């Protein structure tokens, strides 16, 4: 906290040891974005590496939705993502055959992160058409709105079930 203001450090991208030490000293939680996790096996964005003092996200407003991301990644990245999630989620008796958006939500909800956040577009399973923002572009940014048709008993029960399952 900074006074009464809660602070989340945007510690994304290349982090030097100096920056990591500064963040640790500050006590502010950092960010863990699961979409960033699958470029290497030692990625700090893999959920089994999350510490409690962090905020875990499926993706951010500047990323594609999970479904949109998954549709555009390379076959190698997709294979690594699938294999990692299968192994990681098996510890929590999660259904590996869920759609990718729900596996991502299960993965961060199961993590040690004190706070977990998923965009509504990821709960719904929208693809590229649900993207909130594409940095350095004009036109369609920040126009997505939750349409009433998506607010279903199935969606509400799904959110309730994952929240209860992982005691969030």
Residue ranges and their predicted role:
Residues 1-168:
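Catalytic cores of glycan-processing enzymes that make or break glycosidic bonds
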């Amino acid at each position: 906290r900074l006074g009464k203001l809660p602070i989340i450090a945007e510690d994304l991208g290349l982090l030097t040891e100096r920056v990591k030490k500064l963040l640790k000293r500050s006590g502010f939680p950092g960010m863990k974005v699961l979409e960033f996790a699958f470029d290497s096996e030692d990625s700090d964005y893999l959920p089994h590496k999350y510490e409690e003092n962090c905020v875990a996200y499926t993706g951010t407003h500047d990323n594609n939705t999970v479904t949109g991301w998954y549709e555009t990644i390379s076959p190698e990245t997709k294979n690594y993502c699938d294999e990692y999630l299968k192994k990681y989620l098996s510890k929590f008796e999660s259904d590996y055959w869920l759609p990718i958006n729900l596996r991502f939500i299960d993965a961060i909800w199961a993590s040690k992160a004190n706070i977990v956040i998923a965009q509504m577009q990821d709960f719904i399973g929208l693809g590229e058409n649900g993207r909130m923002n594409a940095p350095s572009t004009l036109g369609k940014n920040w126009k997505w709105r939750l349409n009433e048709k998506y607010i279903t008993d199935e969606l509400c029960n799904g959110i309730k079930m994952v929240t209860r399952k992982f005691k969030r």
